[in-house]
């Protein structure tokens, strides 16, 4: 009987289960959406039990639809929406509050207080992160502050904290193990990425009891086996875990220092492998742990772009300029250029390297000759300009010049965008055959732990190129276009 690896990809809007074979090819996939809760403006929450239910449902679906028996699963790898925070009762397994999602801004007030007390440099130095509502630490504090008796119960060891990987491993193992991996721990604002331990000083500042924190383990290791009653009577090794963006870096086989990937989803997340050194950023990048494997930890620099694919959705749903996302490519290619039009899609502010949450979207360079095609092209080009902004500071911080960019995510199907991206960066852009790189990364991490794959070299050799986009633009034009973009961003930031 053939053996397969099962990846659980627990995302922000849906949970997916994907079966991979030995060649790293997708055998079958199942997906289930779950409810988003918005109790107040800017707040985003999930029901952790509903997430768990959705994971069980997709596991059942993928096995039955693919006609794969549970005993044919060699191991399970988990990848997850990062930073999203769950606090639950150790005895009952019941969450004491909804999961607070990474996007949620409900702890912005706590962050402002911490920054006002001058704690930002301390957190930055120890965790590689900024004090921001994005990360888990202030979310745990919020739950402990707002649920009656929670802090006292946490101190007595009655409550457990976890990011979604921890919650799912705990549930799948029947409550036997309370663990996270290095990559997820590095997103909590409580983990020292240099000593590789929960940091007592930071926990003290946040008022989070150490007793509730999971044990931090490598990203590729057998943590536990599934409780038979959760996996059709079978005990399967749960053998790998990583946050979604780090898993994508692994799935793209970016194993050597200086290799980078960009995921074009709702937003963009760009990660560059910096090897065994944690590179401190001077330009608003995050320093994060890529993974812990083979007895060592490797680091990455990360840049975040808030609006990417959602700008294409805006053209479709908000402005009704296109009927499908694919139409954007057709219209963009009908014109030679944007005719001087720039769209700055700062709908919710700008991320790396600007970190300005007040700035709003703007359009510049409109004339009587501007058409729908120019506007659509300018919107697509904005994704590439924002990517160049991030890569420019990555190169400056790391001292590494990028030689190629590997890409994944929904928007990479757009050939116009990929060619323009290559032109603007002056490096080749590589699109892989398997676009589900996040799930593939989780499968690879678990597969290495159970011997399904032998080494990272085997995995790197499996990485298959679907199409390579080579730069065709001359330097003068590239400089002129990018200078125009920088001018547009400055103008947008001045208008508040």
Curated annotation (Swiss-Prot):
Binding-site positions, sn-glycerol 3-phosphate: 12, 82-83, 134, 244
Alphabetic keyword roster: ATP-binding, Glycerol metabolism, Kinase, Nucleotide-binding, Phosphoprotein, Transferase
Activity regulation description: Inhibited by fructose 1,6-bisphosphate and p-chloromercuribenzoate (PCMB).
Residue positions binding glycerol: 82-83, 134, 244-245
Cystines in this chain: none
MF term (GO), any: glycerol kinase activity
Functional summary from the UniProt entry: Key enzyme in the regulation of glycerol uptake and metabolism. Catalyzes the phosphorylation of glycerol to yield sn-glycerol 3-phosphate.
Name used for this protein in its record: Glycerol kinase
Organism: Thermus thermophilus
Lineage of the species this protein comes from: Bacteria, Thermotogati, Deinococcota, Deinococci, Thermales
């Amino acid at each position: 009987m053939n053996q397969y690896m099962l990846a659980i990809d627990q995302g922000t809007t849906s949970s997916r289960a994907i079966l991979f074979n030995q060649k790293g090819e997708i055998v079958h996939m199942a997906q289930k959406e779950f409810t988003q809760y918005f109790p107040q403006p800017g707040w985003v929450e999930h029901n952790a039990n509903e997430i768990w239910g959705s994971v069980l449902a997709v596991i059942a679906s993928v096995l039955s639809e693919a006609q794969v028996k549970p005993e044919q699963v060699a191991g399970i790898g988990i990848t997850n929406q990062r930073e999203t925070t769950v606090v639950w009762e150790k005895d009952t397994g019941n969450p004491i509050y909804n999961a607070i999602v990474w996007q949620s801004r409900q702890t912005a007030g706590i962050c402002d207080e911490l920054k006002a007390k001058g704690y930002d440099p301390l957190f930055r130095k120890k965790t590689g992160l900024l004090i921001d509502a994005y990360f888990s630490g202030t979310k745990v504090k919020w739950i402990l502050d707002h649920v009656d008796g929670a802090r006292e119960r946490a101190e007595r060891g009655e409550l457990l904290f976890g990011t979604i990987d921890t919650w799912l491993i705990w549930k799948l193992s029947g409550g036997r193990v309370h663990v996270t991996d290095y990559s997820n721990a590095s997103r909590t604002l409580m983990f020292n990425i240099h000593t590789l331990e929960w940091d007592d000083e930071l926990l003290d500042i946040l008022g989070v009891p150490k007793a509730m924190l999971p044990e931090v383990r490598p990203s590729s290791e057998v943590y536990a086996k599934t409780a038979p009653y959760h996996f059709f009577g079978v005990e399967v090794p749960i053998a790998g875990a990583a946050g979604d963006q780090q898993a994508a870096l692994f799935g793209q086989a970016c194993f050597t220092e200086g290799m980078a990937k960009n995921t074009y989803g709702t937003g963009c997340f760009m990660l560059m492998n910096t090897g065994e050194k944690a590179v401190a950023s001077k330009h608003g990048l995050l320093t994060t742990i890529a993974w812990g494997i083979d007895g060592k930890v490797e680091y990455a620099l990360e840049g975040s772009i808030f609006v990417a694919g959602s700008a294409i959705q805006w053209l479709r749903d908000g402005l009704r300029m296109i009927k499908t996302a694919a139409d954007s490519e057709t219209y963009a290619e009908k014109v030679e250029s944007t005719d001087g039009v720039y769209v700055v899609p700062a709908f919710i502010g700008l991320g790396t390297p600007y970190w300005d949450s007040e700035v709003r979207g703007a359009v510049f360079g409109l004339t009587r000759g501007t058409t729908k095609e120019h506007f659509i092209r300018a919107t697509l080009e904005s994704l590439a300009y924002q990517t160049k902004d991030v890569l420019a500071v990555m190169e400056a911080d790391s001292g590494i010049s990028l030689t190629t960019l590997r890409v994944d995510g929904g928007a990479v199907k757009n050939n116009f965008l990929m060619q323009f991206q290559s032109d603007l960066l002056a490096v080749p852009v590589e699109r892989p055959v398997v676009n589900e790189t996040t799930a593939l990364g989780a499968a690879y991490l678990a597969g290495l732990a159970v011997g399904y794959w032998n080494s990272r070299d085997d995995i790197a050799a499996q990485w298959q190129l679907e199409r390579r986009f080579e730069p065709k633009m001359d330097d003068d034009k590239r400089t002129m276009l990018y200078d125009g973009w920088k001018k547009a961003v400055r103008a947008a930031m001045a208008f508040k």
